[in-house]
Design a protein with these regions (language model features):
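Extended, well-ordered protein cores
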Residues: 1-187
Length: 187
């Protein structure tokens, strides 16, 4: 079934006459094919907050600039947008609230590079995450801290939605997540 869908998409791309449109559509197809996990199928549960998370294989994205982390988790909701970049299966880093909505991914990528240099002796690869609060300007000054903390929690939950768990020596995948990668109980 998947090969049929790919063939249909390829046929559609062959009908695109404009070079820019072809590049853009091909990049979207490439991005979709690089998705390793999503929490999309968890969204239909009444207990699950509204957020969408994707784990992406950065090496599989043709147009992603260097340096490429091993994986990127992208979390999106109406209140927060977040990413977590990780250079390897075991990586050391942190999370931060960014005030740069236009280029927070660039900011986080720069922090990952610094983390790699800083931790080269301890752990050879780094990780870093960042998030922006989408509605902060709508909050009264006394509500801002609560909004930032709530968005941070949504970010963490979005990553945990995709992350395998451990029970002694067993790895337990998250419910209703189709995995196209190896076990990854990173968090």
């Amino acid at each position: 079934a998947l090969e049929t869908i790919r063939a249909d998409i390829q046929q559609g791309l062959e009908r695109v006459a404009n070079l820019d449109e072809d590049r853009i559509l091909s990049a979207y197809v490439n991005l979709i094919e690089a998705i390793l996990r999503t929490n999309y199928f968890q969204q239909h549960s009444p207990q699950q907050p509204e957020r969408l998370s994707f784990k992406i294989d950065c090496a599989a994205i043709a147009r992603m600039p260097q340096p490429r982390p091993m994986v990127e988790i992208f979390v999106f909701s109406t209140r927060v947008e977040a990413i977590h970049l990780r250079g390897g299966l075991v990586a050391r880093g942190g999370l931060r609230w960014s005030d740069r909505p236009e280029d927070f991914r660039t900011e986080v990528l720069g922090l990952v590079k610094a983390q790699i240099v800083k931790n080269a002796v301890i752990v050879p690869v780094g990780s870093k995450g960042g998030f922006i609060v989408r509605r902060l300007a709508d909050c009264a000054p006394n509500e801002r801290t609560e909004e930032v903390e709530s968005c941070y929690q949504t970010f963490i939950r979005g990553m945990l939605d995709l992350t395998d768990n451990r029970d002694h020596n067993s790895v337990i995948p998250p419910p209703r997540v189709v995995r196209y990668d190896q076990d990854d109980p990173y968090l």
